[in-house]
Amino acid sequence: MTQLLERAGTGSTVLHATSRPWASALFQGRRHIIVLALEGVDASTRADRFADGIEEAQWNLNRHFVADITIDDQRPTDNGVQIELAALTIEDW
């Protein structure tokens, strides 16, 4: 979460986060859904920067790696922008 908030910038908070187990025939990991609130006059610009290249971003996780990450929804709010993203993390053997 810390890395996501750093990427989103000052004035960003986690509104909601869920995580559930995920497995395939060869791998196991977790599926995450995270909703971020970006607030402030520059929220729209920060949201665009946050989303730009997120699929190729490098994440430092202990014993896991990010196999997939996507922005599922991005919408304006009264105070800024709300972003919903999904990520799949896989155990790194």
Predicted regions and their residues:
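Long, contiguous binding/interaction regions
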Residues: 1-93
